[in-house]
Amino acid sequence: LEQFGARIVATHPYDIRREDRLKGQEIWADYASVTATETFAMIAATAEDSSVLMNAASEPHVQALCEMLRSMGAKIDGLGTSRLSVTGVERLSGTRVRVPDDHHEVATFLAIGGVTGGRLTVKTDITPHMTLILRQFEKLGLQFETTDDSITVTGWTREISRPYTREM
């Protein structure tokens, strides 16, 4: 917030002040943080001028938040990349939004289905975003069938002789 021109007074709770509209900024993040990227997008959406975040997080839920902001009138480019560009608008409007499924939750249910040796189908709207996670599960011997709106896991197909994670 301070980089955008807000003044933060360390009280409890924090007192955040600004004289006028926040100013667009170019920011280089030390690492790709979901929270930092989402906060940047929300602030930059109504900041004056343009803002750029380098090393932005690009997870599906970050993209979903940016899509919601777009539906409210925000001008955001670079979704799914490490460079997020936002041109601030004077005001955002209301919108209707459906929050996508959480990939951690979907993966947890798939893991439960896998370790119990059964067959479990998870209905989800994020199947296309689960590819990397499914690849890792397949290394452990799990098998999957996917459709546009579901993932079915079939339990263990091989014995695990040692932990998957190697010593660092």
Sequence positions of predicted segments:
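Structural preference for solvent-exposed beta-strand-turn elements
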Residues: 1-168
